[in-house]
Amino acid sequence: MTPTLDTKYVFTITARIGDVVTAGETGIGVRRIIPIIGGEVTGAVTGKVLPFGADFQTIRPNELIDLEAKYAFETADGAIVYVENKGIRFGPVELLQELKRGEPVDPKLIYFRTVPRFETGHEKYRWLMEHIFVASAARHADRVVIDVHQVM
């Protein structure tokens, strides 16, 4: 028998976002680019989200949204951690349309899950590269809140 999969909450990334840029229909869906302009990291790791990077999204014809965010944060003790976070967001079409317009939607009604990967040269945070992480997220008008869990 293989090891049991358990997860443990480790930290939350709150990424503030800028205005959406749309590249239009690309043949596989509508391509959107959402700049990441700052934010914070709280929990077992603390720090600030650096004001660069973006979430590159493709909205499929069925409204399923493929997400691929690339950005970085700086820990409270000065380590730089690069983040690549891939995932999906899906839910009732009318609620997804409300989110696109920046209207509030109960996060429990939207399936928004990601698999973040981290890179850093700082020895103290090497463990971020030695484990698998999964996340549950919520989109708000001005930010995305990502609760990161370590797979044990």
Swiss-Prot record:
Q: HAMAP family annotated for this entry?
A: UPF0311 (MF_00775)
Top-level division of the source organism's lineage? Bacteria
Against Pfam families, the record matches this protein to: DUF3237
The UniProt entry, under NCBIfam families, shows:
PRK00872.1-1
Q: Which family does it belong to?
A: Belongs to the UPF0311 family.
What organism, scientifically named, is this protein from?
Bradyrhizobium diazoefficiens (strain JCM 10833 / BCRC 13528 / IAM 13628 / NBRC 14792 / USDA 110)
PANTHER family on file: UPF0311 PROTEIN BLR7842
Protein's recorded name: UPF0311 protein blr7842
